[in-house]
Amino acid sequence: FFIMRGANSHLDFDLDLAKDESEKNPVYYLQYANARISNLLKRYDKDIVGDPSINLSLLKEKDEISLAKLLSEFPNKMDEVSKALEPRKLGTYLEDVASAYHKFYGNHKVIDPQNIELSFARKKLCEATKIILKNGLSILGITAPDKM
């Protein structure tokens, strides 16, 4: 909670919100996105046999492209955060990543045994999202559980 605010901004700590297991709690929201991806990757390995060669050009949907673009901003975002000494910006960025992931996940079938190539490309997008979330959370000193 403290990391999600600027150093000079006023904070009224809400203990009920800190305990809340919903999207209203920013830490829970980020951890939930990571756990959701972990669960999806386990299901993928059960439902899809083998991995085809990767073809990321299959990712053409607006939500897929938006998420991929957001993930590509991570190195620049880290540079910005470190130069400004504002971890709040990393927290905000990670919330944007989690939100984009949830939108993508809600709108598209990631695991489709009838379309293994697209499923594999989407799996790779999910894996990249998990890496960004896990690394970002670690930098902020927040755990990234695989189950919730």
Language model segments and positions:
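Non-catalytic interaction-recognition regions
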Residues: 1-148
